[in-house]
Regions:
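Charged, amphipathic alpha-helical segments and their flanking helix caps
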Residues: 1-32, 37-45, 49-153
Length: 153
């Protein structure tokens, strides 16, 4: 993944609600893995960010070609009974905007070149009831091969 540290730093330093990179910034290689993480809600502290790599050949058949120049960041929140899901979308939208602003600021300070971004609303609903997770997927595009920027080890 493009430095989990980069995204974690951006979230922990400027986005309210994020304080623990170990429980709130998660990693996955495909949509199925993300949904599996969200199904086990006990292991997820909301709000959370899930970094989805696209450089794993296993996702090629389902989600398109292996890609070393983009990375998805999912910003997710949850709502319970009596709460309005539109509030969760609004809250996670605000978190996503703050994250993007910080990443652009970091890019201007010399971090890997962020070429652009795209986002869309995404939904997840636990199959057998319980809590709901809602949020946004941000697809970050970089001008460099981010697999070469990953720390060794």
């Amino acid at each position: 993944m493009l430095s989990k540290n980069l995204i974690s730093s951006a979230l922990i330093n400027v986005v309210p609600g994020f304080s623990n990179a170990d429980t709130q910034v998660l990693e996955a290689q495909s949509l199925d893995t993300i949904l599996e993480l969200l199904t086990n809600l006990r292991s997820v502290e909301f709000p959370c960010a899930i970094l989805e790599g696209r450089s794993n050949g296993a996702i090629q058949l389902v989600e398109g070609p292996v890609d070393f120049f983009t990375q998805s960041v999912w910003i997710m929140g949850q709502f319970g009974r009596g709460e309005d899901e539109s509030d969760v979308y609004a809250d996670t939208h605000a978190l996503a905007i703050r994250l993007l602003a910080k990443l652009i600021q970091m890019r201007n300070a010399g971090e890997p070149a962020l070429e652009g971004w795209d986002w869309r609303r995404t939904q997840y609903m636990k199959r057998y009831g319980g809590q709901n997770a809602r949020g946004w997927e941000i697809v970050l595009s970089f001008t460099e091969n981010i697999s070469l920027l990953m720390p060794e080890g």
